Amino acid sequence: MGLTRDLPTQASTQSIAFRVNGSAASSPVAGAAVGNRMVRLDGKRKVDGSEIFGADETPAGALAVRAIRNPHHRARFTFGDLAKFVRDHPGIEAVFTAKDVPGVNCYGVIGKYADQPVFAEVEARHRGEAVAAVVGDAATVEALQVADFPVVWQELPFIQDIDAALAPGADRIHENRPDNILVRGRVVRGNVDEAFASAEVVAEAEYETGFVEHAYIEPEAGFARRVGDQVEIQACTQAPYMDRSDIAAILGIAPERVRIIPTAVGGGFGSKLDLSVQPFLAVAAWHLAKPVRMVYSRTESILSTTKRHPARMKLRAGCAKNGKLMALDFAADFNTGAYSSWGPTVSARVPVHASGPYYVPNYRALTRAIHTNLVPAGAFRGFGVPQAAIAQEQLYDELADRVGMDRLEFRILNALDETTPTVTGQVLGAGVGIRACLEALRPRWKASRGEAEEFNSTASGPLRHGVGVAGMWYGCGNTSLPNPSTVRIGLKRDGRIVLHQGAVDIGQGSNTIVTQICADMLGAPIERFDLLSGDTAITPDCGKTSASRQTFVTGRAAQMASELLRRGILDLAGTCECATLQFDENGVTVHEGGTSHLVSLEALPLDEHGYVITSEATFDPPTSPLDENGQGNPYAVYGFGAHMAEIEVDTELGTVRVLRVTAAHDVGRAINPTLIEGQIEGGVAQGLGMALMEEFFPGKGENLHDYLIPSAGDIPPVESILIEEPSPIGPFGAKGIGEQAVIPTAPAILNALHDAIGIRVRKVPATPDRVRAAILASKSVNGETRG
């Protein structure tokens, strides 16, 4: 029996299989999974080491693949005698270059902007770009000296900063993109100029943020093999179906002839949405018909993969004397590097969000993604919104100070609600929890502000304390674009439930969350499920793991598919909707009123999927396109939050220590509070790094010695406050949390820095040298003695 429901379109096919094994201590009773702090379904495997990551498997006889990369910021190149190189190096089996790509030597995450070659053809546009791949036995490939490879480089003038890229007469990074502008973003509402003319208080500022490396624990890795006229790739990824489409185009074959099998992922944060090892593996496996394996070193990973966009932002805000916001004018340029990657998404998402979660009746936000000869900037937890929050939340503090308002109360006064339109004109109607988040911080805010003032008033040494706050909002899913998820559920003759869901769990817990949702919709215990996740040959397409969409979108599709399966069982039993189901080793028992009926499954015929009943549902969040002024409904659901940071500053050294973070987040419904708290704590850690230490300099910091990330000693206690303002269309009211958790941390810390010592660091991160320089500059302006 097959049951399908599409809302509104699309199904395909994806998986890693494992049986859910629970215990009385770890698994909730039937019907009580949602809201339960059950342990992750893959938790034991991660702890005992049995989980399979990208580098953990090597097929028998697999050859090693190694990329030859451009060592310069920009260079032309020519090859010597590659055939002779292979002959002269026993153990090397082949060298592949652009001419060996069977299909299109171009890929990209957004089709119309695709511009990145598998192998550069004549010119390498950035340091670390691949020009060739060497394939051979592992020992020989690993021992190969790059200087022995026959390639001659001709260094070319290069562009690294936005001003140089935009300068008249600047070299074009891509001939078809005048002025090196990849794309522009725009949201305009009301009359900004008139509003500023009547605003009683105005503040303006400029902020700059740098490159940030993802620094996940697992560098990119995987293997591939050709199976007849198909190719299979097992690798770490956030987007198996996107990978499949790109690899098919690169090989010049139909997508159905490419199978992507995601491994467990040791962190992604957006970078593993882009291809890494996959094209090299695919080309080598296709030509050689042998298994091939590739594992990036940490240096290679940092050198060649995407980063958070550096941003240069200029903004101005105005309000009335009572603190009500009247206008915001925001302009930002993002350094998108040599190739497009997710630059268009960043440019589109930021103008929607740069107001923050506040009612701003007159608004203008203009963005540009600018090409340079740097490693591509791509997706990184928040798609540019964390950069915008750093600017807008500090400016709102300045406005609050100028009107003499408490900084938290200023935000509460201006917070969006269910009836006020956003800057795109969208009225959300329900599920707007920003005011509740801000109000949840109020007791701690008042107490901490008093403690900091008391400390500073009696401090005789260089230490000062400060408290800062910042709000956030974030749309779940793609911006005004379709982003459906399809989930299939099958009931076996023995009463076990097989969940086919293609959402890749990159550490956030989607395998567990989606299973909890299905369990409660069916009234089944977690132990009755077998989970298949993230394999393009086995599970339907659940879209990419990004944009805080999996709990909301895939979770909703799973809820719908579970509802269909339940109806199918009730139809078999001939009972009404009010009946309840009991799943156990005997099959399924239907309870209605005072009677019970065992549904016999063993005699039922199997459908095309091998189940007695199969249900499938697709959910695509309802959005609308934005018009030329960015007006419309870009997201169906938004997550909201607010963070408060307490810090200590050493005014002699310029060092900042975060003492505590209190984080309030509107999650709609907390499907698994423990997993949500984990996301919040991880977001705080990344936000702290962005605020105080993380900055990547190409060619200078391609290792984790020179590139600083927070260590355990840097992470403060984090108090998480979960607010539940349900979304009418989320599964059990749930929203996303993955990206929301990182956005307000950095601005809260930077606002606390100003609260402590009265300075603003306009270029982030606020490293000790920058903090110290700002202190000295402030003393100079105020006529104090330097020291």
Which residues does each predicted region cover?
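Conserved catalytic cysteine-centered active-site region
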Residues: 123, 254-256, 260-262, 285-297, ...
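Flexible, low-hydrophobicity surface segments
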Residues: 2-182, 202, 287
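Thiamine diphosphate
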Residues: 264-289, 293-294, 510-517
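Short acidic, glycine/serine/threonine-rich loops at helix termini
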Residues: 106-110, 144-148, 244-246, 269-275, ...
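Short, aliphatic-rich beta-strand segments
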Residues: 65, 231-235, 496-501, 658-660
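Glycine-rich loop/linker segments at domain edges
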Residues: 36, 42-48, 179-222, 228, ...
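Helix-loop-helix junctions that connect adjacent transmembrane helices in secondary transporters/permeases
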Residues: 170-251, 415-496, 703-721
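C-terminal catalytic domains of large/alpha subunits in multi-subunit enzymes
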Residues: 2-8, 98-101, 252-257, 287-292, ...
